[in-house]
Amino acid sequence: PQIETLKPGVKMTLLAEHPALVTPTGIDLDDKGRIWLAACHTHFRPEGYEGPQHDEILVFDADGKNRRVFYNKTDATMHVEVGPDGWIYLAERDRVLRVKDSDGDGTGDTEENLATLDTVADYPHNGLSGMAWDPNGGLVFSLGENFGKDWTLTGTDGAKVSGRGEGGVFRCTADGKGLRRIARGFWNPFGLLVRADGE
């Protein structure tokens, strides 16, 4: 289909498409222009699905070429965000984690949980989802309405936030400390953005 841009001078170029990627649920760019993408193979996986058992965190060069799998050990992966010091941040339904390639082979081999969600709800896309960085280097992420079930979110330092039936936006440090809720009253807030002024 023909795509029309709304702003003069903006150009859109197709860089990658199916079958190189499947069900993209998050995308980010790093300082080298590489494209990081969460390809979700586990969201309502159909019977007889022949794709990978888990979701894939894919990396493409800036031109959309040289597809490689960085990580493939998460399920219901709803977002990917490039972070500081080589960490790649992921939002799964029940946790926010970060993954790093510590030996330089291009594959994530070190994983750390930053925030874990304790709840009986398991619907794949109304748990943890969107992520962004605030101007002070804090990680901002969101939680959906969680099917109206009780939940408790816990950071790496033991800080806890609990609730029921409403989505929200949370902030913690890049290593999962100081967890706190900064907004509430959302359905499933996937596309988080933080302006330069922190709003």
Segments predicted by a language model, with ranges:
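Beta-propeller domains with acidic blade repeats across secreted/periplasmic ectodomains
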Residues: P1-E199
